[in-house]
Amino acid sequence: MRASLDDLRAKILEVSDFPEAGLSFQDLSLLLADRECFRTAVDLLAEWARAKKPEIVLGAEAGGFILGGALAHVLGTGFVAARRPDLPSSEVFRGDWEDEGGAGPLELSAGLIPEGSRVLVHDDLLATGATAQAKAESVERLGGEVVGIVFVVELQLLNGRRRLADRDVHSLIKL
């Protein structure tokens, strides 16, 4: 049986004043632990993304790895991890981001995004749009084409869509 969007929303735990006072962290752990909610989230993201005909799903550490890998499996694509720096890797391409929760670099291993490949960018949460924009720009600098950006949760108050206005963006749950 497929879970509803209300079921998914009910599995998102809000942690107040994290990572700093006045901000809230949206914890998807309960959603991921519930097999029907997990399956529904992946299926709904895939339904939207399938028409984009991606060849690669790119997910950022850490939230984008879990659902991004499952999404790539359902879509029959490869999966590329945008990782935090200083992990063992081959030659890397580095992109930087900054948002309300901090700033930092993201790294992509060179050669994982072939020139002209169609890339779907995924993360668990859209806040300011800074990390999604950094990922999309990194893909494009490497010669890939960003065909869409998908999120499980969108925090509307932070208006991340404004930063991504020129992109095809989809989120399952708007808070």
Which residue ranges define each predicted feature?
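PRPP-associated nucleotide enzymes
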Residues: 1-175
